[in-house]
Amino acid sequence: MNPSYKPSDVESAAQAQWSAADAYRVTEDASRKKYYACSMLPYPSGKLHMGHVRNYTINDMLTRYLRMSGYNVLMPMGWDAFGLPAENAALKNGVPPAKWTYENIDYMRGQLQAMGLAIDWSREIATCDPSYYKWNQWLFLKMLEKGIAYRKTQVVNWDPVDQTVLANEQVIDGKGWRTGATVERREIPGYYLKISDYAEELLEHTQHKLPGWPERVKLMQENWIGKSEGVRFAFTHDIQDASGRLIQDGRMYVFTTRADTIMGVTFCAVAPEHPLAAHAATLDPKVAAFIEECKSGGTTEAELATQEKKGVPTGLTVKHPITEEQVPVWVGNYVLINYGDGAVMGVPAHDERDFAFANKYGIEIIQVVLVDDEPHFDYHRWQDWYGDKQRGVTINSDNFSGMTHKEAVAAVAHALAQKGLGEMQTTWRLRDWGVSRQRYWGTPIPIIHCDEHGAVPVPEKDLPVVLPTDCVPDGSGNPLAKHEGFHAGVVCPVCGKPARRETDTMDTFVDSSWYFMRYCDPKNEQAMVAEGADYWMPMDQYIGGIEHAILHLLYARFWTKVMRDLGLVKVDEPFSKLLTQGMVLNHIYYHRDEKGGKNYHPPLEVTPTLDAQGRIVGGTTADGTKIEYGGVGKMGKSERNGVDPQDLIEKYGADTARLYTMFTAPPEATLEWNDAAVEGSYRFLRRVWNFGVAQADVAPVAFGGQAFGKAAQALRREVHTVLRQVDYDYQRMQYNTVVSGAMKLLNALEGFKPDGSAGDAAALREGLGILLRCLYPATPHITHQLWQHLGYDKELGDLLDAPWPVVDVAALEQDEIELMLQVNGKLRGALRVPAGASKAEIEALALSCDDFVKFAEGAPAKRVIVVPGRLVNVVI
C-alpha cells in the first residue's frame, strides 16, 4: 500500500477491477426492489464540462447508495447525437457530421469512464444509430395511422442563415437563438403531432400525478399548457374576395376570457396572415407594405410581449355582435395567426396592450367596468385597476350593466348563443408540435413523395430509412435534397413509379422523448420496447437542468402517453421524481476592444483587484492588461470561464472533482467555482488516505463482544450519530451535508485517544469502515482501494455490494447528559447529570453544584424548574 496518495494510481486500479468484473451490468430481477435513476443524456459536443460532472455525480451517488441498500439499480448512458451543431462543425472542418459525432462520443465516453461512474455501458445508445431512430420512424407511422401525426402548411419562424424552421422557444428578441439572424415568417408545409389532443390529460397529471416534481417546474408546465375558459364568437361582415365570395363565410371569429367587456370594443385586430388582412392588402399599398414588414418578426408570444405594438387600419369594418355597430379592423403585428383564430377584439379601457395601441393611434376608449373606491378613469395613463376583473362591475353596457365579471360573461355568452354567433369554449396555449426540420443531421421522416399519389408513408418492412453518413454540408440548404443516393431507386409504395424521399428530418426533441425507455431494452430488434420497460418504468429519479423544464419534459410526457395508448408501455407518466440541479458558475473577466466589444479572459489568467470590502472589482493579466469584472455567470465557451474536468482529474483525480461538486452546494442550488475549495477537497482525501495507511499495519479485529471504555463509547456515539444524519441526508439527496458528515467522521477518528480498553481497536475499525461506506458513493476509487487494503472486503464483501451500515441505537445512549443551568431565568452554567436521573436527583445536583452556590450567594431556593433533556432553572 503506497504511503502517499496517488489519485491516478488509485483510480486506474479501481477502474480496472470494476471493468474486469463487469461490475455495473444490470439485469431485471423480479425478486428485488428496482430503482431506475437517469441523467438527461448529453449532446456529444466533444468534451464534458463541469455541469456534466455535477449532474452525473449526483446520479452516481444515488445509484451507489441504493445498491448498497439492497436495490437493483439501473444507471444507463447514451448520446443525444443528432442536431445542428454537428452540421456546423462539419461545415467548419469539412468532415461528415457522422465522423465528428462518433469521434466525440468515443472521447466523452472515456471521460465518463475516468470519472468512475457506475454506468451500465451494455445499454448505451446513440440517437444517430439506425437501430435507434428506426423506432422514431416506426412510431411516426403509427401516429399517422391514428391521426396523431398530420401534414399542414403553417406560418413558421424561418432562420435565413441556417435555412431552417425554429421552434418558438428558439427565437430570442426576434432573432435565431444560434445565428442571431433576424427571423422571418414563412408559410411552409410540415408534419405536426397532436399534442393538443393530450392537453387536458397533461394538465391534470401535472397537477395530480407528479408529487415528486419541483413545484416550480410543474407551474411552468401548467402555464405552457395554458388552459383558458372563455367565449368564442363572431363579428359578422359582408366583405367579399375578388371572386365575389364572402371571406370566411362572413364571420370573423375571436376568443376572449373577458366577454364582460364586449360593450367596450372599439376596434378589432387581425394577424398579418389573416384572410381579411390579405384582402385589405390588395386594396391598400400601405397595408401590403406593413404585412411585408411583419414577415421579418418572430412568431413567439415572448417576443410579441416585448416588441413595439404597431398596426395599420385596413379600411374594413365588421359588425358588433350585440350593438350591431360597425367596428374598424386593423392589422396588428402583435396578433398571431397560429393562436386562436388569428383575430382579437380591442377593448382599450380594460386591456393594457389595447390601451397603449389605442392611445398611439387615436382609437376611441370606452370604459365599461368600474371598481369602487378607485380614482377617476384617466384615458391617457394606464392603471392596474382597469383590468381588475375580480372587483369590477360592468357599466355603460346596456342590459349587461351592474354585473360582476362571472355574471356578465355568462349573460353575454347566452346572448351570443341565442344569436347563433358564439358559445363558451375552452382554449389552450399549447400548440401542436411541428416536428419537420429542414436539416440534414436528424431522423429522416419516413415519407415518399409521388407525383400521382402525393405523400405516401414508407412501408414498415422498409424501415429504417437510413440517413446517408457521407454528407458534408456546404451551408446551402438541406444536403438531402441534393444527395442522389438518398433518392436512388425510390419508388411509390402505391403505384411503383419513381418517386423521391421526404428531405425534412425530425426535430431532435423526438430523439430525446423516449430514449429512457429504450435503455430498458436497447438491443431489441423486434420491438421498440418490451418486457424491460415493464420492469424499469416509470423512472424513479430523473436528473437534469431547469432549462429543460418545458419542452423536453413536456414532449417526453406526451410521447409516453402516445406509447401507452398504442399498448407499448403501461405507465401514464415517465418520471416519478425530478431533480433539477443548479448551474455551475464562475467569474467572468473581459477587456473591451476599440469598438467596445468584449474580449473574455479565463479566470486563471487574471489577477483580481479587490476593493476595501474584499470584493472583486476588476483585475490585470500577466502582461498588465486592465481587465473588467463581469460578475459571476454560468460556465461557458463564449465567456471563456469554464473549467475543463480533464485538467482537474489529471491534477487532483476524479474523486476530488466529484467530492468538490457535491460538497460545495446542495444539488438543486447553483455552485460557484472556487479553486481554493478544490484544493481543500483534495487535502481531505489525502487525510483519509493517510489515516487508512496508518491503520494498515493494525491487525483486523472482529467486532462484537468487546467491553468499551469511555473513549470508545464516545467515539461510537459520535460515529453512529453522524451515520444517522448521513443516512437521512442520502435519502433526501442532500449530498453536501453527506460530505460534511464524512468530514466529521474523519475528525472523530483522527481525534480518538484510546484509554486501553479491550474495545478500542474494534471501535476504531468499525468507525473507519462506516466512514469508507459513507464516503464511497461520492469518492468510489479511494474508498474502494482502502476497503480492500484494510481487509474489509474479507468481512463484508466488495464495497460495491457491501451492506449499508446500520445505526446502533444502543451506541447513541449516553451515561451523562448536559443541561443548561439557569438562576432566575438567566444562564449561569452547565449541569452534567446521569442520563436516567429523576427530577428529584436533578434538583439535588443543581442545588449543590458550584455554579449555583456561586450565584445564589447563600439565598435559599424557592422553586426548581426542570425541563427534561434541556435545562434546570432555580428560582431564588
UniProtKB/Swiss-Prot annotation:
It comes from the Bacteria. The keyword Protein biosynthesis applies. Keywords: Aminoacyl-tRNA synthetase, ATP-binding, Cytoplasm, Ligase, Nucleotide-binding, Protein biosynthesis. ATP binds at residue 637. Pfam families: Anticodon_1, tRNA-synt_1_2, tRNA-synt_1g. One of its GO terms (molecular function) is leucine-tRNA ligase activity. GO terms for cellular component: cytosol. It is an enzyme of class 6 (ligase). Its EC number is 6.1.1.4. It is found in: Cytoplasm. One of its GO terms (biological process) is leucyl-tRNA aminoacylation. Coiled coil: none annotated. The keyword Phosphoprotein does not apply. Its main location: cytoplasm. It catalyses: tRNA(Leu) + L-leucine + ATP = L-leucyl-tRNA(Leu) + AMP + diphosphate. A motif ('HIGH' region) lies at residues 42-52. A motif ('KMSKS' region) lies at residues 634-638. Belongs to the class-I aminoacyl-tRNA synthetase family. HAMAP family: Leu_tRNA_synth_B. This is Leucine--tRNA ligase. It comes from Variovorax paradoxus (strain S110). The gene is leuS.
